[in-house]
């Protein structure tokens, strides 16, 4: 993102803390909700697993398509409109989700949620704090990923309880209220007076376009992009299917909720370990470990049904390996 003027760029603990709360709610109520409503959706709407999964895939596609324009809007100082609008859109779509009665309606809702995710999750808020705190953005990002990493720990049990108590439709409406009543006001109030682009660092549009194109076509950029795509295809796909996958493994409902919920806490541990590596070892060693930890965790999960009495220990091994790897990946990425 573009460097901003030095004016009003001192670190603000309160702003970062409240933005972190909004991240916790946004991740928990949108990204981690699908795995819990997949089963009820399929039963009530008569959908196959492929048809229900397509809804989440469409959301991810919509999020990806909006990533670049959202970044440009934030870079031009429209962060308040982007993130407040994204929270309102998320609330509207979650509320509409409670009224979904067809496959087409489900897909429309999740495309809208994909647009909302592009405007309210980590990527846009990281851009915001980088512009606001150019000399202290790392501290802000660390804080937000610590609290945001607990989204599954908080919201998977909460959403499961809401579904059991209210039904999945009213549960979605309750989650919608959090975006309208909490996230949208937070973004609207906190993100006033967006910093302006520094004139000293302004770049002619034509030169900026050529520079961007050169970077995007360079071998390092393409290799990093390939790595991120491959890793994210796993880290995004598994949470969406984890609850149903664990149920198919024959685990009890307590384990089914506890396992994905506990991954959030382990992710925070992974981020702490990353900073330990940075201080005491070569950070690139951690970068090389990440692609190993998560596949090993998946192998442990797949092998769990055939491990007999060690089944519980193997599942815990999956939680530890996957959680640490995914927690580190967020920071490194």
Predicted segments, located by residue:
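Extracytoplasmic gate region of multi-pass secondary transporters
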Residues: 30-39, 213-276
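Extracytoplasmic
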Residues: 14-52, 66-70, 156, 231, ...
